[in-house]
Amino acid sequence: MKKKNSKTKAAMTLAWGFVREAGLPLGEAMHRAYLNIALDARLKLGQSVEIAYRKADGTIREAIAVAARAGQDLVKGTGHGAPDRNYLYFDVGKNEFRCFCKARLLVVL
């Protein structure tokens, strides 16, 4: 019995969501899906990661991100997390929590 490649399946699922919701071409959507998977893997290891993403107004934000899970108990709110299409992180430079649409991720350094 062959072992299924879960990384490829996750990338395809994420990419098709980008195609449907953001109207990205499939090649660009696959590239951004693999960037999101790489970002998630590095943050789960506890590393700080330099990222860049396009904001809704078209400007590009560069940030040093760490996993938001570590400090989420400090956040008060409605109890509803960020939607699955958004990525929540803690911005070290601004010292606050931020989020961005996964389809807008440009670079993971």
List PLM regions with ranges.
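Basic, alpha-helical nucleic-acid-binding regions used in initiation and control of genome expression
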Residues: K44-S48
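A short beta-strand micro-motif
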Residues: V49-K55
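Short aromatic-glycine-enriched beta-strand elements
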Residues: H80-L88
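Structured surface patches comprising rigid loops and adjacent beta-strands/short helices at the edges
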Residues: Q72-D73, K94-L109
